[in-house]
């Protein structure tokens, strides 16, 4: 049989490569479609499972929170139950700290060697242990501690904030003090840890625990601190006008012994203990006292080479020093001089200034409603005599009624130097004016033009005309007519009642008038008319107050110190010059003072 010839050589290349059958292609496409649907179904299931998982996670978080809340509530209830059944803690005050010690022949027991504290608890003194959780170094005597039911110190607290008030009288070593309590009862107390590092001085008020005998804290006493104003004055002698001779007298009495103590000792001289400044009010007594303190500080710095050396000016407010309780005023005086000695102990000059000295230390036996001066005056005398051992303390008293001060205070050896601060005359008033009218002030153009623009010449002319107006004895300046017991009469002018304070008021008024003119007329500068107007207004302000001036001072001005004034008549003719003069009724028995 003849074989069939092979037809492969007659096929196309595609047929030779094995092209898919159409039926097979449809089958494959169908399978792919089914696979896609299954993938989409699986994706949907996966998303659903993810949502279920997220919801389960959220529910789980809520469940955890609820469980935590339930746990906390259970713990709170458990703690509440524990606290309800827990015994109370007690308080104690530390009396002594006992660190751990080595046993000795007589003290080998645990109570004597182990770390412990002595406390005061429920009226008993006890030695108790300290919890290991409490740092022994953070405990101090006088401090409160917390004790458990076994009386073991489990916590350190603060210091008691309430207690009995006492006054420190004397320090006894470093940890004890002598204090004065109610009814002048003296007591020895111990200082708590809070006061060990604090500087205490005699007169300080302390709060104490009367049960334990510990001083707990230092209490500020505002009513005492207000009586003494400690300051470093910035007033110099150059700031004071019209008192040249008085200042020179004070400098000789105060600064010479301070600058040349060797010469004074060589000649057997002692520095004065005190100065009395007396005279009418408003004439510079307080300013001089401050200038003395400032000058002493400057001289002390020059002598010692210590530029940081300060001076202290203890300004005693006289009327406020008085106290209705017996012994309180004397205690305040002792406190003042104790503070002065403390400040002067390091070489700083101290001036103790008693203003209105007559209100405190008047002549014994002259009191009408009380005899408080019978104890205050001796207290001051003893303190002044005690200043003898201190070279840096000087007492300065100021008064406009020096005749009322007890003679024992004014005798030599106490207030040695007595300086009368008189009312300023015309020359002194001009000197005071120069302190307030200076060349740096704005002056009106018309006043400057009268002196070719020379500011100093303008100031000189203003002051000269103002002083002439103040010290004129014309009829317009008549103020009072004084009649004495012997029938003599004397006319007193406004110049007889002038003072440094009046001069300052005149200048202040003139400056105020200049400001008002600037606001209304737009013309700037001080004018002589402002000063003259201020003089008139200042004098007229005193029209209704002639009886406020000391009649004894009027007698001194007229040279009849011992004569009694029986009648006073005002001559002022009213602010507008139209009102009639006024008179004070004749007093049949006025005594030495009106």
Curated annotation (Swiss-Prot):
One of its GO terms (cellular component) is proteasome complex. ATP binds at residues 282-287. Residues 35-86 form a coiled coil. Residues 1-10 have a biased composition (Polar residues). HAMAP family: ARC_ATPase. ATPase which is responsible for recognizing, binding, unfolding and translocation of pupylated proteins into the bacterial 20S proteasome core particle. May be essential for opening the gate of the 20S proteasome via an interaction with its C-terminus, thereby allowing substrate entry and access to the site of proteolysis. Thus, the C-termini of the proteasomal ATPase may function like a 'key in a lock' to induce gate opening and therefore regulate proteolysis. This is Proteasome-associated ATPase. It comes from Arthrobacter sp. (strain FB24).
């Amino acid at each position: 049989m003849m074989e069939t010839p092979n037809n492969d050589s007659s096929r196309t290349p595609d047929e030779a490569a094995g092209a898919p059958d159409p039926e097979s292609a449809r089958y494959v496409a169908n399978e792919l479609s089914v696979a896609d649907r299954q993938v989409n179904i699986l994706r949907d299931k996966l998303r659903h499972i993810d949502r279920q998982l997220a919801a389960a996670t959220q529910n789980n978080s809520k469940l955890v929170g609820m469980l935590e809340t339930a746990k906390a509530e259970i713990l709170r209830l458990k703690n509440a139950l524990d606290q309800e059944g827990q015994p109370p803690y007690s308080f104690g005050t530390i009396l002594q700290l006992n660190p751990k010690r080595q046993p000795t022949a007589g003290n080998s027991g645990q109570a004597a060697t182990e770390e412990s504290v002595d406390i005061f608890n429920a009226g008993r003194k006890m030695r108790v242990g300290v919890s290991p959780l409490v740092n022994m170094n953070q405990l101090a005597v006088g401090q409160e501690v917390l004790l458990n039911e076994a009386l073991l110190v489990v916590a350190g607290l603060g210091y008691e904030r309430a207690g009995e008030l006492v006054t420190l009288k004397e320090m006894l070593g470093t940890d004890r003090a002598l204090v004065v309590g109610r009814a002048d009862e003296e007591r020895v107390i111990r200082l708590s840890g809070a006061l060990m590092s604090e500087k205490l001085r005699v007169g300080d008020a302390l709060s104490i625990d009367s049960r334990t005998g510990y001083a707990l804290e230092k209490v500020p006493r505002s009513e005492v601190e207000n009586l003494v104003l400690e300051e470093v004055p910035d007033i110099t002698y150059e700031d004071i006008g019209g008192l040249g001779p008085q200042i020179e007298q004070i400098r000789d009495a105060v600064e010479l012994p301070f600058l040349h103590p060797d010469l004074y000792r060589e000649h057997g001289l002692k520095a004065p203990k005190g100065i009395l400044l007396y005279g009418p009010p408003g004439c510079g007594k307080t300013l001089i006292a401050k200038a003395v303190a400032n000058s002493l500080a400057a001289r002390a710095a020059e002598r010692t080479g210590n530029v940081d050396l300060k001076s202290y000016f203890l300004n005693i407010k006289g009327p406020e020093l008085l106290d209705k309780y017996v012994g309180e005023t004397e205690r305040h005086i002792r406190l003042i001089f104790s503070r002065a000695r403390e400040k002067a102990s390091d070489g700083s000059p101290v001036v103790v200034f008693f203003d209105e000295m007559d209100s405190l230390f008047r002549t014994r036996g002259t009191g009408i409603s009380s005899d408080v001066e019978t104890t205050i005056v001796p207290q001051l005398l003893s303190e002044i005599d005690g200043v003898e051992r201190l070279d840096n303390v000087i007492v300065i008293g100021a008064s406009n009624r020096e005749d009322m001060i007890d003679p024992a205070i004014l005798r030599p050896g106490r207030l040695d130097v007595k300086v009368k601060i008189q009312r300023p005359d015309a020359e002194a008033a001009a000197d005071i004016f120069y302190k307030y009218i200076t060349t740096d002030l704005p002056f009106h153009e018309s006043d400057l033009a009268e002196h070719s623009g020379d500011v100093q010449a303008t100031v000189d002319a203003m002051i000269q005309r103002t002083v002439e107006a103040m010290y004129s004895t014309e009829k317009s300046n008549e103020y009072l007519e004084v009649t004495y017991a012997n029938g003599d009469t004397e006319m007193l002018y406004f110049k007889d009642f002038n003072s440094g304070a009046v001069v300052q008021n005149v200048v202040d008024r003139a400056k105020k008038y200049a400001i008002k003119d600037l606001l209304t007329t737009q013309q700037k500068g001080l004018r002589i008319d402002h000063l003259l107007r201020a003089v008139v207004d200042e004098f007229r302000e005193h029209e209704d107050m002639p009886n406020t001036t000391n009649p004894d001072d009027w007698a001194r001005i007229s040279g009849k110190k011992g004569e009694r004034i029986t009648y006073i008549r005002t001559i002022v003719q009213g602010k507008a010059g139209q009102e009639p003069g006024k008179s004070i009724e004749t007093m049949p028995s006025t005594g030495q003072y009106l």
